[in-house]
């Protein structure tokens, strides 16, 4: 056991896996390739017996093309109730042969696909922010909100403790006619700070989450929710408000270089926004959509990561030791901060990105749909190593969905257990201490004699000091609780975080 308090499950619903399961066929079932609802209940009970809460992933922006309601929509006529569940529009051009707008999607050249691809005969187009197999729901239709409340209740009634809300900012869209073309709106990411943009982060979506919060609060204890909302930092607390979802991932650390000034700015800004909006900060260094943090820090900052992945990791060397050191130190840093911390699976092992997945085994649609110009996200999704050797490095008896490299064995749970200097044992100790040391969500910054060293304390005397780079730094007086690297002769090495009691 690592000492985690919550397990946030990856997507597990029935799916053709056009986008790793985020093309959902049925929101209230388990993919038969993975098990059954009875298996889910058994797992949930076992985790609860171990004192671990369980979160599940909810994908409210889109379904899959195999969802029964989308099949019904394709078979129905324009203007029908079935089509009103999705976003269908007539095309441009003399015969409707052009898509309604020139918007690209994340995974395809166009955000619109002609219904004929799935056998439709009405000459309309449907909208999808992501793959063509992921048609967007029409959240102006009350039937959609009612059905998602049904889904949330279905899982909460089974005992699920919380929900991760995928693409939480994208549900509501202004699709009033005439539809705007790309050059008349800021398309790529939300930039409107007032919540009045056209396609993302509209204030109306917060009203959806206020309704969800009422449902969550009807349970004892209330159900938790965390938004994956790629919005401007000043907008993030609106999703984390106690009136809406309650938490929102703060992604600022994910691409932040391991640097004292950058880290301090991220912390100060996030805590100030949370305080102003009566919400709580939520920290993370990685997720299933990002290159592993250890590899980011092991690569030189000027390296183009996309090109590096396309080269199968051969274009530039990775300093695996430095990368892992920085990853463990950064995780100890965020674990000491006020608020909630989410650790991406594998970070507790110091795992690096698997860059050399063979082309014929790549699963991420990003690769083919971007004409092989970006390798995608598979490298951080490779199944974890549990044993030094053996089939799948201990990850089950069947086949694994992505190939594991030979070097995985040295990062395995078996290889690290019992050695108190390994990332796994450091995490185990830190998570146990974190539970014991919880205090009011406040911190105080302390002066250091170097700009590349940060020192803060929590109200109960829990101190955290990080030496980001440069030479060794004198250890302040106090009892060392845990350190990401050994403190020898009272000196903190570079790339090290230490917790201590003053």
Question: Model regions: which residues?
Answer:
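Active-site and adjacent substrate-binding regions of carbohydrate-active enzymes
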Residues: 1-478, 482-502
């Amino acid at each position: 056991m690592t000492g985690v308090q919550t397990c946030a499950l990856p997507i597990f619903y029935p799916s053709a896996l056009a986008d790793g399961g985020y093309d959902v066929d049925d929101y209230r079932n388990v993919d038969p390739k993975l098990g059954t609802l009875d298996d889910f209940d058994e797992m949930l009970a076992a985790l609860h017996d171990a004192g671990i809460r369980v979160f599940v992933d909810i994908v409210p922006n889109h379904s899959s093309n195999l969802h029964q309601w989308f099949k019904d929509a394709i078979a129905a006529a324009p203007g029908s109730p079935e089509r009103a569940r999705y976003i269908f529009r007539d095309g441009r051009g003399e015969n409707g042969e052009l898509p309604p707008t020139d918007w690209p999607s994340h995974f395809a050249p166009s955000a619109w696909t002609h219904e004929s691809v799935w056998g439709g005969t009405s000459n309309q187009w449907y909208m999808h922010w992501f793959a063509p197999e992921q048609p967007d729901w029409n959240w102006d239709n009350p039937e959609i909100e009612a059905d998602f409340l049904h889904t949330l209740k279905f899982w909460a009634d089974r005992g699920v403790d919380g929900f991760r809300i995928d693409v939480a900012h994208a549900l509501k869209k202004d699709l009033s006619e005439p539809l705007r073309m790309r050059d008349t709106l800021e398309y790529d990411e939300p930039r409107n700070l007032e919540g009045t943009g056209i396609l993302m982060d509209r204030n109306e979506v917060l009203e959806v989450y206020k309704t969800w919060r009422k449902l969550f609060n009807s349970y004892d204890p209330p159900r938790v929710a965390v938004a994956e909302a790629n919005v401007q930092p000043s907008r993030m607390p609106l999703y984390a408000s106690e009136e809406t979802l309650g938490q929102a991932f703060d992604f600022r650390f994910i691409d932040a270089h391991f640097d004292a000034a950058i880290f301090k700015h991220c912390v100060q800004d996030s805590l100030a926004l949370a305080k102003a909006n009566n919400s709580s900060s939520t920290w993370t260094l990685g997720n299933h959509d990002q290159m592993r943090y250890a590899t980011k820090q092991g690569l030189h900052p000027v390296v183009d990561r996309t090109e590096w992945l396309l080269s199968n990791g051969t274009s530039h060397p990775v300093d695996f030791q430095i990368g892992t050191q920085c990853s463990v130190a950064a995780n100890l840093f965020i674990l000491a901060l006020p608020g909630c911390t989410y650790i991406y699976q594998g970070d507790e092992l110091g795992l690096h990105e698997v860059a050399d997945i063979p082309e014929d085994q790549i699963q991420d649609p990003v690769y083919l749909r971007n004409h092989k110009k970006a390798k995608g996200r598979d490298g951080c999704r490779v199944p974890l190593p549990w044993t030094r050797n053996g089939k799948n490095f201990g990850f089950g008896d069947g086949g694994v969905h992505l190939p594991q490299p030979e070097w995985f064995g040295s990062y395995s749970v078996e290889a690290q257990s019992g050695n108190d200097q390994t990332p796994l044992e450091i995490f185990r100790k830190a998570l146990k201490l974190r539970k014991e040391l919880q205090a009011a969500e406040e911190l105080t910054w302390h002066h250091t004699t170097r700009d590349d060293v940060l020192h803060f304390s929590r109200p109960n005397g829990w101190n955290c000091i990080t030496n980001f780079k440069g030479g060794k730094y004198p250890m302040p007086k106090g009892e060392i609780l845990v350190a990401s690297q050994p403190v020898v002769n009272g000196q903190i090495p570079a790339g090290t975080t230490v917790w201590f009691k003053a």
